[in-house]
Structures are given as structure tokens and as C-alpha cells.
Amino acid sequence: MSQTSNPIYGLRRNNGFAGGSNPSNNNNNNSNNNHNGNRISLGSATRTSSIISNNLPFRQSLLHGNYDNAINNTPSTSSLQKQSQQQQQSSQTSQTKRRSTLLSTPATTTKRRQSMMGNNLHQQHQYGSTALRHSTQPSSSMNSQFNQALQHVSPYYNPTSYSSQTPSSQPSSQQYQQQQQQANIPSSASSSQQQQSMDPRPLKDKKYQELIQKEIIRYLIDYKFEIKTNIALTENILKSPTQKNFNAIFKFLYNQLDPNYMFIKSSIEQEIVTLLKLLNYPYMHTITRSHFSAVGGNNWPTFLGILYWLVELNLSLSTLNDDDFLADDDFDKIFIEYIWKSYSLFINDEEEEEQQQQEQQQQANNGGSGGGGGDKFYNDMKIKFDQLQEKLNQELNNVEQQHENLLNKYHELNNQLKIRDDALKKTVALEEDYMKLKSYNQNVEKMMPEWNKKLEQLSNEVISYEEQMNKLQDEKKSIEMDLQQRGISIDKVNELYIKRDQLSKSIEIISNKIDDLKEKLSGRSFDLEKNFDNLENLTNQYNEITNKFNYYYYQQIQQNQQQDQQQQEEEEEEEEEEEHQLIPQFGLKLDENIKTTNERRQFTRDEIFLNINVKQERQNLLNFRNELDHQILNDRSQAMKFNEKCDIEQDKIKDQQSIIEELKIQDSLMKRKSDDLKQTIFQIQNEFNSQIESLDQQIRETKSNIQSDILQLERKLRDVNLNKSLIQEQLIGKRQKIDEDVINLTSFILKFKTNIQEKLINIADIVQDQLKKEQQQQQQQQASQQLE
């Protein structure tokens, strides 16, 4: 399909879609593009209309996409053919089950309204436009699956045909890793993050690069790259490329996707990065903006992979037709046709004053109702809609009649089945009864001879029992005669027996009640003990948990004490006492006397626990939970900051890896230079060897002179040692004299000290005696004054 000649495709690639990749261009660009004679405004008439079919689950909008949804919704290549066959069958049988979406906004607003056409139209289901992608999840078999999908979509461009010619052209991931290790290339096994983000395509394999280059060149030739760009396609254009050639190829491939997009010359590298992000290029992590400064060299395989990925994307889109962009529902097709025609009128400025006057006159004739009933397109749409609705109503009536006939047949058959089931059940029951009766008759026939013997025994027993009854009656009469003679009647005896029976029954009832109460009390006491034990276990578990809380508070206090070490020790002790008083000591302690008490009453929660209020404990726990929540929020904010720092560091690591590769290239160049230096050094070494031999002779002569000088120095050293020993003896004598003088001085000082102390003691005694005398004189004077 020629993408430039399709009006629907051009509309979808207008500002409503392509503008999403560069919002600044949508707001500031007031230029107009001509498309098949229809003027399309890029700035003022910004409209979006996305119609997505349900037939192709992997076909979704291109530029407003989400790569994750595309991967999740993309079927595997092995099941694409089955799904296409099923979809063709379902499209022939039931077209009414399909739905589509039409999102339309006027030129002056940005609000989105859902398209509705009366109460009889199907409710439109909104789909968020997601990216059109094949299943390109990073795995070792991704390339084969992707090529199979392309073969299903476009058999002409089939990279697997080349692989059949060269079986070893696409090595496996294991072979590629071995090649990396042999070439001293840093593999991605150094860290788990790099393994997850590694591009599984063997882009650095030369055979694989040749296959990719052939595919790209074939695509460029078929779509007339040389004519449109005036750049000649040669074999070296993709082997030793330039920055200009890469930019031109990328522009051409992207314009195949979005013909209306305009590139900015000053910042094309930044545009490429943003466009790849919008297209959700799956290996964007391997590219940074610094790589675009030097496209060639070691960075070229990654850029070659970008171009090949764009070629595959264009090939997959080349199989789409105009019908793929239309709705599957007939009502939607009618409504879309109406919107398309009215939209083309709006874009071409064909809504002139004459049409407006006609609409106003027709609205006045219709009494102000109808809202544009004279519109030609609207009338056509209404006629088609009515015809389609009549057709569907007829089909629906036919289906309802068939449904009623089938229901009647179903009820008739169901009644017949019920009668048959009842008959079967009755026959089964009769057969069971017959078998039981037959077995019973057989048992009776077997027991017949034994019954005669038992009848004779029973008759003899009856005769003996009758004789015993006669004897007992005679005894009864004799006892009654005796009681009458004694004055005791039989009725009184019977009454006494009845009272005794009643009393015995009442006693039994009371005893049974007592036993029941004892059992209930024992069960209640057992339950109470069990509940008390459970409560004790719960308190122990609670205390174990709260010990951790107390330890947490203790750690906080220690931290506060370390921060306040500059204060005085007394103030620290006082603050520690106050802090210990303010610490909420978590924990509960049961009153063990509850088991032993005989009080018959119900204990409250506060009475069960010793010196602890449960409400206060609960309040302390709530405060502690609030503190923990506050700390968790702080920790999360710090974690977010750390994650941001990690992302920055990862970007730095990627840049450093690229620098390392460049340094390795420099290292290989330096090795070559070092080999050249080794040869020059070997020549210089030979020259120096000849010089060394001449210098050895000079060294021998100098050694003989040095030995004679050493002998002279040894003689001088002996003389110096003798002088040293004499000086040491003189110093020892002087030191002994100094020690004697020091001892004499110390003895003199001690004597002087003792004499002074004795004199001071005597003076103190004299002073005390004088004070006593003066005090006695003062007392005598006071006494004499008092007497006077």
C-alpha cells in the first residue's frame, strides 16, 4: 500500500497522531500541507480519529503506544495463522459482534466525546491506542520468532532465506558469548542487571551484519531512496558510514511511517532519541546521546540494528490496507463515512454561506427541530441506517421465530423424556420389590419345620404358666383375708405404694439435676481455666513482642544520649531519669490470685492485670504505631532518592563502558607501537653493551683505589675509639662527684625542714596558751560586771 496516497492513512498521521511525538510542533506550526488536493491544517484543525479493529489483535496504533501492552497482547507467530482462519470464519458468520472506536473532537476544543448515533446504535468501546509491535522480548530465540512473523506478514522480505544459504550466518547466543570472551569483550555476565538488559541480537557478528545490510539496501532500493534523497547506494554506505548517511537513512525510514513529520537540522540527534522512545524501541538502554557524536567505529552495530528494526516495522505496516483502519460494524461504517465527508468539507473550507443559509431555511421549515436535517450527508447516513436497521430487524424476527419453534420442540421432547424416566424408575422399583418378596418366601419355606417344634414348646409353657397363675391367685386371696382381719385395706396400701413411687421419682429427678449442675460447674471451671491459660499464653506472646518495642525505645534513648555528650554530667543524669519516666514500658502481667480466689463474681479487664490500664497500653501502642509509620515514610523517601542516584550512576556506567571499549582500541594501537619500540631498544641495547665493557675496566681501577682509602680510614677509626674510651672514664668520675653533692644537699634540706616544723609547733602552742588566758580574763571581767 502506498502510504502517501492514502487519505485515511494521511489523516491518521496528521497532528492527531504524529503530533503526539512532538507537542511543540502541534502548538506552534501554522503551516498547511496539501494532500491529494485537500488542504489539511496542522495547527488550527487538530482532530483525532482512531478506528481500531478487533480482527487483528496485534495491529494497534503506531505513535501513541505502549510497548508493554503490545507485547502482552501480541500472539506468538505459531498461532497467527490459526487466529487468522478463525477470524475469517467468525467475520462471515457474525459481523454484529464486532465493535470499533471513534474518538472525535472539534477544532476549537480539546474535549473528547464518544460517538453515539441514537439509542439503537451499539455502544462504542474505547480503546487506548497502543504501539504496533511484534513479540520482541529479550530471549535467545527472539530473532527466529521475529523473522517467522515477518515471513507470515511479508514473504518477499524474508531474512531466513539467507540463513538457509548460510547455515552458520546466525550464531546462537552461546557461540556469540564465546566469541566475546575470545576477543576480550566485556560480557554481560558481570552483573545481573546487564544480563536482563542485553540486546540478544548478534549485532557484532559480521555475517549477521551482512544479512542486515542486504535487507536494508533492498528495502531502500524498492522504495526509491536514491531518487528521493540524491544519495547513491553502494556497498560501503552501510559498512563505513558517515553521520550524514545515517541521518538521511533514518529520516527516510521514519518518513515512511510518518510522511508529514519535519526534522529540525540543528538537533537531529536529540530528535532521533525522542522518536525512538516514542516508538518504544526495545533496546533503548544500549544508546545514549553521546553515541550519536560518532556513529562509526564500535558504535555502528547498534545503529545498524536501529535501521534494521525500522525496516522490519515498515514491512509489517506495508501489509495493512484501508479496510484495516475502518470499523468492522456496519453501523460504524455508515457513521464513519458521514464523518469523513463532513470532515473533508470542514478541512477544505467548503462550508460557505449558501450552505449555512440553506440549513437555516430548512431548520425554520422544520420548526427549529432536527438540528441540520437538511444536510445531504446526514440524510444519506440516515437512509442507510434505516435500511440496515430494517434488514437487521427482519433477520432478528426470523431468528426469534426459529427460536420459538426450537423451544416448543424442546418442551415436547422434555415432557416425553420425563414420562420415560418415570416409567424406568417404576420398573426398577418393581424389580427390587419382586426380588425382596422372592427372598422372603424362600426364607419362610426354610423356617417351616422349625416352627412346629417351637409351637409344641410354647403350648407346654402356657400350661405350666396357667398352673402358676392359679396358685398365685389362691395366695393373693389368703393375704387379702389376713389384711382385712388386721384392719388394713388394700386401697391404702396401693396409695402408699403410689406415694413411694412419686417420692422416689422426685428424688431421682433432683439427683439428676444436681449431677447436671455439677457437670456444668466442672465444665465451666474447666473452660475458665482453659481461657485463663490461653489468656496467659497471649500475654506471654504479647510481652515477647513488646520487649522488642522497649528495646527499640532504649536504643533511641542511647542515641539521644550520644548526641547530648557535651552537656554536664549532672544534667545528663537528671535528663536520663526524666526520660526513663517518660518511656512507655509495654507489657502486661496477669493476677495469678484469680485462680485461687473463691469470690463468685466477674472480673473486669483492669482487675485481671496488675497495676496496668489496658486503655493506656492501647494508647501507647497507637502512638508507637504512628511513630513507626512516620519513620517508614521517611525511609521510603530516602529509598526513592537512592533509586534516583542509582539510575544516574547506571547512566554513568554505560558511558564508561563505551569509553572502555575505545580505550581497548587505543590499547591495541599502543601494543603495536610498543613492538616498534622493542626493536629500537634492542639496537640501543647492543650499543650500550659495548659501552658497559669499557666502563667495567674503569670500575676495576676505581675499586683498587677505594680499598687503599678504606685501610687509611680504618686506622683513623681506631684512634677515635681510644679517645672515646678516655672521655667516657672522665665523665663517669664527674657524675659520681655530682651524686655525692646532691646527697649532701638533700640531707641538709631535710634537717632544715624538721627544725622549722618544730619551731612552728612551739609557736602554735604558745599562741593557744595566750588565747586561753585572754578568754579567761574576759570571762572574769564579764562575771564581775554582772555582779556589779
Curated annotation (Swiss-Prot):
Compartments, as annotated in UniProt: Nucleus; Chromosome, Centromere, Kinetochore
Keyword terms of this UniProt record: Cell cycle, Cell division, Centromere, Chromosome, Coiled coil, Kinetochore, Mitosis, Nucleus
Biased segments, Acidic residues type: 567-579
Compositionally biased region (Low complexity): 14-38, 76-95, 155-197
Molecular-function annotations in GO: microtubule binding
Domain of life from the UniProt record: Eukaryota
Coiled coil location: 346-788
GO cellular component: Ndc80 complex; nucleus
Positions of the UniProt region annotated as Disordered: 1-42, 66-119, 155-205, 351-373, 559-582
Function in brief: Acts as a component of the essential kinetochore-associated NDC80 complex, which is required for chromosome segregation and spindle checkpoint activity.
Designated name of the protein: Probable kinetochore protein NDC80
Species per Swiss-Prot/TrEMBL record: Candida albicans (strain SC5314 / ATCC MYA-2876)
Gene name as annotated: NDC80
